[in-house]
């Protein structure tokens, strides 16, 4: 078992010995290579359209490279240990541009909301590509990242747990719908070993999970809670919990993990 401090640094398994144990050595795809690619793009198209509809988003392009001095890149966590790939570029320039490959589009998206003149409760979505050279590589984490990044303009009064919960439910609705679509279109994917996504999410604060499993590091706490409920959304993963550790190290310059959001039995819990 990892100790709690070792277990803080982002997603994934954290040791290559554990990766070796968890990776199946007899894996066979349920679809052939061609149909796998077709299914991937069907799912991506469904989710893109679903997010656009549910969250009022427009699809935009995001840069792969930004100027290192722009402040647009993402350090991924609060201790600055995951640095971006940087290189000089600009043939013929007396002073080359110091370029930086994006690790995430988090800061750029907030600038882009203004650039695209989005109104309140309008937003953007982008199919972001990035390189995270300092990522631990495991069964579902790569140094190459291809992910959706979305952002929405909200009012200050929207900074509530109820608004966050409503947004998460809309996203989950899209995911469940995407699974149903791809299962119907590719019936080979209907395998009893892989049960369908639950229709409903269970919402819980990181402090409450710690109270249930006080002696376990957070990844094992996550495993226990997901075994109990099937699908879980965790509030408050960045604020320091009762045991002196945050649920996970989060970036200090854009994630809101300090806003008080829940009070139970006279106790304040932090972090959206």
PLM-predicted stretches and their roles:
Residues 2-7, 11-141, 149-153:
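Class II aminoacyl-tRNA synthetase-like tRNA-binding/catalytic domains
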Residues 32, 36, 53, 71, ...:
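Alpha-helix capping and helix-coil boundary motifs
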Residues 42, 145, 229:
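Short, well-structured alpha-helical interface segments that form or flank functional binding sites
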Residues 50, 54-58, 174-178, 182, ...:
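Short secondary-structure junctions and interdomain/linker hinges
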Residues 92-110, 162-167, 211-237:
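Hydrophobic transmembrane alpha-helix bundles
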Residues 111-126, 180-185, 237-261:
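A short, terminal or domain-edge coil/loop segment
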Residues 121, 126-215:
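Extended, charged alpha-beta segments that form solvent-exposed binding/catalytic grooves
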Residues 203-272:
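A translation/RNA-centric and nucleic-acid-associated enzymatic feature enriched
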């Amino acid at each position: 078992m990892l100790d709690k401090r070792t277990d803080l640094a982002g997603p994934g398994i954290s040791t290559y010995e554990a990766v070796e144990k968890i990776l199946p050595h007899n894996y066979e795809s349920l679809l052939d290579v061609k149909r796998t690619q077709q299914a991937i793009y069907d799912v991506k198209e469904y989710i893109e359209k679903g997010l656009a509809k549910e969250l009022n988003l427009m699809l935009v392009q995001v840069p792969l490279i930004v100027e290192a001095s722009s402040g647009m890149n993402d350090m991924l966590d609060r201790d600055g240990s995951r640095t971006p790939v940087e290189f000089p570029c600009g043939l013929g320039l007396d002073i080359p541009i110091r370029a930086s490959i994006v690790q995430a589009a988090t800061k750029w998206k907030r600038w882009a909301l203004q650039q695209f003149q989005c109104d309140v409760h309008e937003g953007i979505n982008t199919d972001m590509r990035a390189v995270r050279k300092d990522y631990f590589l495991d069964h579902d984490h790569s140094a190459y990242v291809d992910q959706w990044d979305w952002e929405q303009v909200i009012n200050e009064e929207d900074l509530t747990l109820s608004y966050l919960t409503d947004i998460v439910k809309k996203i989950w609705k899209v995911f469940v719908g995407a699974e149903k679509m791809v299962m119907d279109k590719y019936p080979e994917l209907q395998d009893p070993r892989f049960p369908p996504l639950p229709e409903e999410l269970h919402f819980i604060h990181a402090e409450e999970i710690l109270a249930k499993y006080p002696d376990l590091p957070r990844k094992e706490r996550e495993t226990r809670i997901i075994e109990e409920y099937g699908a879980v959304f965790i509030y408050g993963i960045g604020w320091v919990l009762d045991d002196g550790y945050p649920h996970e190290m989060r970036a200090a310059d854009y994630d809101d993990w300090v806003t008080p959001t829940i009070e139970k039995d006279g106790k304040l819990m932090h972090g959206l």
